[in-house]
Curated annotation (Swiss-Prot):
This is Large ribosomal subunit protein uL10. Part of the ribosomal stalk of the 50S ribosomal subunit. The N-terminus interacts with L11 and the large rRNA to form the base of the stalk. The C-terminus forms an elongated spine to which L12 dimers bind in a sequential fashion forming a multimeric L10(L12)X complex. GO terms for cellular component: ribonucleoprotein complex; ribosome. One of its GO terms (molecular function) is rRNA binding. It comes from the Bacteria. It comes from Enterobacter cloacae. Keywords: Ribonucleoprotein, Ribosomal protein, RNA-binding, rRNA-binding.
Amino acid sequence: MALNLQDKQAIVAEVSEVAKGALS
């Protein structure tokens, strides 16, 4: 499964936002 850089960045941003929400 090959994702381009923009897709990876979008996924990372989404995951970190969810993680921040879960930790706060």
